[in-house]
Amino acid sequence: QSLPLITAAHARSAGVDKGLKGIATRILRIPLKNRADYLFTCSKEAGIAVYGTKAVRDGRVWTIPNAIDAERFHFQQNVRDEIRTELGIQDKFVIGHVGRFGFMKNHTYLVDIFAKVCKERDDAVLVMIGKGEQEETIREKIKGLGLEDKAYFLGNRYDVEKYYQAFDYFVFPSTFEGLPGSVAEAQAAGLHCLVSDRVTREVALTPLVSYRNIEEDSKLWAEEILQNAQEALRREDMREAVAQKGFDVRRQAVQMAEFYRTGQNPPGHTTE
């Protein structure tokens, strides 16, 4: 008996590359929905991008969340104090971002937002975790704005959960995404999240997420952050809320193992 063929879609941006790479991606995508026994995706938008609207509408595509270890990310005051002391930002208003320095993460716009916040709050700092080809460009932009003493580039971190504790606000202005795990992690840490409207609504696991258009003036993003800054300091335990939405990796692992064992009842839900 042949093994079932499973394919998974993780990016709503599939095929956006220009030239031959984009053409090849779109062509190679065609057989997926016809040859695979199971079509998995991390979000409805990613499913449509890779498998097409009809496959999603017909209920052939299963959404399986990019689950996280919610326990690992829950808020701990002692960890917050430790990291803020380590970085020398004990009394600062900390805007945080976790993501690769690539064009899709839109760090240029993130810096524009931060610059507007700094005009109103002298205690604001920006902490960015990640590496990528756009990092030097962003460093130069920050230097040009005279904000180099307020921006922290921490590179890739294996202990990223500690840094979510140190943030006061999480800002994520991506140009496109599948279902960003960092936004789920930020919510598990009890952070208010201001997210691009290009990011799927499926990642709003809690009331902590709000969306804004990335085409609008960055000043409007800054104003929302400033308006909610005081409320954002009151952190809540969101572990169970995240788990209830199917984003707890421990629960999902049990369901996934059972599916691989039996070939029946994939975790998640059909994407319609």
What is each residue range found by the language model?
Residues 156, 175:
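Aromatic "clamp/platform" in nucleotide-sugar-dependent glycosyltransferases that forms part
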Residues 232-268:
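A charged, aromatic-enriched C-terminal amphipathic alpha-helix characteristic of glycosyltransferases
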Residues 4, 8-44, 48-56:
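A conserved, positively charged/aromatic
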Residues 93, 97-116, 133-139:
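A conserved mid-protein helix/loop that constitutes part of the nucleotide-sugar donor-binding site
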Residues 192-196, 201:
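Short hydrophobic beta-strand element within catalytic cores of glycosyltransferases
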Residues 48-52, 59-60, 65-86, 250, ...:
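Acidic anion/phosphate-binding donor-loop and adjacent secondary structure
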Residues 139-155:
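Nucleotide-activated donor-binding/catalytic signature segment of Leloir-type glycosyltransferases, i.e.
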